[in-house]
Amino acid sequence: AEHLTEMMTQVCGTAATLEDVSSRVPFYIAADSPAIQTLITTYNDVTGENKKPFTMGGGTYARHFPYAVSFGPEHTDIELPEFAGPMHGANEGTPFEKLIEALKIYILALLRLQEIEL
């Protein structure tokens, strides 16, 4: 928080103030860790794609566990019917085939994660 205040003061001078800043220790697991490599390999094996792991801003439930990440398919290219809402939105929807594919990914990933040393 102090670093943010200092940076803002350098950029804005006295034209702005920063109050009630809170921050958390960053939560990060390296992309080359065995667990992340197992997850992305599993995803790519099931889907036939060649995706790379990525990080995102914001907080997730994963930070409440000692060694966890958010993981799952994201299909922004799929056209949904009018009644289906976007990911994490009201009436979230996806085609049934993609639900089955996700289930395969999760089951295989869990089986593979049991075989590695964390």
Label every PLM stretch briefly.
Residues 1-118:
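Metal-dependent amide/peptide-bond hydrolase catalytic core
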